[in-house]
Amino acid sequence: MKHTIYWNEKYTGAEHAFDTTRKSGEIADAIGHEHITDPASNGHVALHNANDEIKKALSADYYEDLKTGGPKSQSNGFAWDYGIWEMALNSTAGVMSATAEAIVNNTVAGSLSSGLHHAHHNNGAGFCTVNGLAVTANWLNSLHVTILDFDAHCGGGTVKMLRHLNIDSRVEQYDISTNYFDEYEEDETHNIRIARSDADYTDAVNETLNKVNPNTNVILYNAGTDPYPTISHETLAEREHTVFQWAKQHNIPIAYVLAGGYTSAQTMDSLVDSHVNTLDAAESIV
């Protein structure tokens, strides 16, 4: 891999074993750790920067509970241990690092982060702990940001958090989902498209990309593979090539994260392969 991919073992350090807390390690093993960059050693973003940005974006009680095991620490659906906080901190640093890398070098970069888009500023939800997408968008200050949320479920936590932080005027979000879980109130630049067949899904991808502000400074791509089995692996792989080629053709930096994808629908090997399709498509534009 020539493009930068961020990950470290803290991404999988939580005691609670679930796809969200484990699959990134399997993906890192599959592509080879020589292709991985540790966000904790990244020159663009230090862990203390990520900590500061998380603290800035979250409510004070949720921030403290995540670090200490307080009442809201299990709102993501996981039993708490300190590894949950370290996972969220390092994963968020990875999203920030990938975004900085993409912007500084006008390229593509990724983080093997997941468990982001349902979390809000004052609680986790739906296996999501800290919304690294919203935290990163907030950190980018005056830049225009486009979030493409192509997960089986809607990214309502992100949109609600953008509105809470009062940055939704410069951060647009477009969802393509297979159901309305975690839907949000839509407007012109924050909207949802539901697609439940391969043909409709492909149309939705092309039509959604045409909505993106051509002057956006960066795309944050939440690249879920959990539309499978409603949507075929082949169509999802085609989606990845379409998204990354579109970003390259429009000269827009793009940073991606893993989003959903679960062994309840397929084997771990199949799940890893489907996520590696995202990495391969990103690599094709370097």
Regions found by a protein language model. Give the residues of each.
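N-terminal low-complexity, Ser/Thr- and acidic-residue-enriched intrinsically disordered segments
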Residues: 1-51
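Glycine-/proline-rich flexible loop or hinge segments
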Residues: 9-14, 48-52, 71-84
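Short, solvent-exposed coil/turn elements at secondary-structure transition points
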Residues: 11, 42, 48, 60, ...
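Extended, hydrophobic alpha-helical segments
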Residues: 24-34, 64-65, 72, 84-88
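Short, glycine/charge-rich beta-strand/loop segments that flank catalytic centers
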Residues: 40-52, 111-117, 152
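Charged, often glycine-rich, active-site loop that binds/positions anionic groups
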Residues: 43-71
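A general "terminal functional-core" signal
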Residues: 69-286
